[in-house]
Regions:
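N-terminal capping/small domains of soluble enzymes
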Residues: 2-159, 165-175
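Conserved catalytic or regulatory cores that recognize and/or transform ribose-phosphate-containing ligands
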Residues: 12, 20, 24-28, 32-33, ...
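A cross-family glycoside hydrolase active-site/sugar-binding cleft signature
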Residues: 72-76, 103, 180-184, 209-211, ...
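Active-site-proximal loop/turn and secondary-structure-junction residues that shape catalytic pockets
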Residues: 74-80, 106, 185-187, 214-216, ...
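Short amphipathic alpha-helices and their capping/turn segments at secondary-structure boundaries
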Residues: 81-95, 193-202, 237-249
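Active-site beta->alpha loop and helix N-cap motifs at the rims of alpha/beta catalytic domains
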Residues: 116-235, 247
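Metal-dependent phosphodiesterase/phospholipase catalytic core, i.e.
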Residues: 230-238, 252-255
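Single conserved hydrophobic/aromatic residue that forms the stacking wall/gate
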Residues: 256-267
Length: 267
């Protein structure tokens, strides 16, 4: 987040004609610009586009050097995600290469209104998208909180201390990180998979994990007895997810296929 962006926001707001009217005297363009910086992601699509570019960069870095890996932390509630990322940023000084991972088994066990369930796609199909939205709501709140504190420090600082605080504002790193979201086996045919993927992307997901099992017979990927779909059917679901990403303008999409127990593969 750069100073020039803040200045640009102030200049843009100053061009709003209402600021010249007496009824707007109490509204300060600088404060409105601060609020815009505290809420730089206006929608889940904005988040998906931002995080997808991060993930693509990280995958390219890993392909070039396997020691440049990422870490994905399981998370089942927005507050947990918020505290994780605040702690990570405080400990490491950055959120770089730190992701959140929404596994289907975790959603089934901890987020279903039916109560704890096994990893068999029996939970509500919209629960993953709902959790994605919740996580990013809390992470955006973390941004607003930290920047709000810096703005208050800036207002109270002496002239000699202001440049240091301004530099912290200019170099602020968001708590928004990529989410890998599990769509199980798509919760139906390719059209159902497309609709579900679209909802997840609209909530902010930049990466979707999908399995080639029959949706109604879905089991945990670590268990035996899985019933898989024909190759053509699975490709149709993969393409359905790709179309969902492309329709929403998220071009740096990422898809992961569970090809065997404990192994993830990019597709």
């Amino acid at each position: 987040m750069s100073k020039s962006k803040f200045t640009t926001e102030v200049e843009h707001l100053n061009k709003i004609t209402e600021f010249t009217e007496s009824s707007w005297n109490s509204i300060k363009p600088e404060y409105a610009a601060r609020m815009r910086l505290q809420n730089q992601f206006k929608s889940g699509i904005d988040i998906a586009k931002y995080t997808s570019s991060l993930m693509r960069k990280d995958m390219d870095a890993y392909d070039a050097d396997s020691s440049s890996y990422t870490q994905s932390l399981g998370c089942w509630h927005g507050f947990i995600a918020q505290q994780k990322l605040i702690s990570i940023k405080k400990h490491f000084g950055t959120t770089d290469k730190k992701y959140l991972y929404l596994s289907g088994w975790m959603i089934a066990a901890l987020r279903s209104e039916f109560g704890p369930l096994p990893d068999q796609s029996m939970h509500e199909k919209t629960s993953v998208a709902a959790l994605i939205k919740e996580l990013y709501t809390f992470l955006r709140q973390a941004d607003a909180r930290e920047l709000g504190g810096l703005f208050r420090e800036l207002d109270a600082a002496s002239d000699s201390d202001k440049p240091t605080i301004q530099e912290k504002i200019d170099s602020f790193e968001t708590h928004i990180v990529p989410i890998i979201a599990d769509i199980d086996a798509g919760f139906g045919n390719e059209e159902a998979t497309y609709l579900m993927a679209k909802q997840m992307i609209e909530a902010g997901a930049c990466c979707i994990q999908i399995e080639n099992q029959v949706s109604d017979e879905k089991q945990c990927g670590h268990q035996d007895g899985k019933v898989t779909v024909p190759h053509a059917d699975f490709l149709a679901k993969i393409n359905a997810v790709r179309y969902a990403f492309l329709e929403l303008g998220v071009d740096d999409l990422s898809l992961i296929h569970i090809s065997e127990p404990t192994r993830l593969r990019r597709i």
